[in-house]
């Protein structure tokens, strides 16, 4: 499992010209599922995502988490994150979870995040062609692994 987080002033996901998820200040998280991702990994990643300190405190240091700020969380499935890009000129997706496994894992991850982040969690639409827009704040971007 990989999660690419970006601190955002705002972010939205459109499918077929319809907004399916949007947030104000918070985090956009692109989520790539890998074969065999476990419940423990999903739980750990949710804890890291909600507790990772990427927001400024009063002194301007990145010392506050999404949990601290009460910001929005927009989760978007993105199987291309799990691509193997080490050789050649074309990515291989054999390291990404098969679609049914990835959807089940992603949905469980969303559920865990919703249980632990009262301000709310928005999502894209699994498997759909999505148009994702964000106003990147910083930019601040991190790749998390459980």
Curated annotation (Swiss-Prot):
The keyword Nucleotide-binding is assigned to this record: no
Short motif (Gly-cisPro motif, important for rejection of L-amino acids): ranges: 138-139
GO MF annotations, alphabetized: D-tyrosyl-tRNA(Tyr) deacylase activity; Gly-tRNA(Ala) deacylase activity; Ser(Gly)-tRNA(Ala) hydrolase activity; tRNA binding
Predominant subcellular localization, coarse grouping: cytoplasm
Enzyme Commission (EC) number: 3.1.1.96
Subcellular location: Cytoplasm
Top-level lineage group: Bacteria
PANTHER family: D-AMINOACYL-TRNA DEACYLASE 1, D-TYROSYL-TRNA TYR DEACYLASE
Quaternary structure note: Homodimer.
Family, as annotated: Belongs to the DTD family.
Description of its domains: A Gly-cisPro motif from one monomer fits into the active site of the other monomer to allow specific chiral rejection of L-amino acids.
Protein name, UniProt field: D-aminoacyl-tRNA deacylase
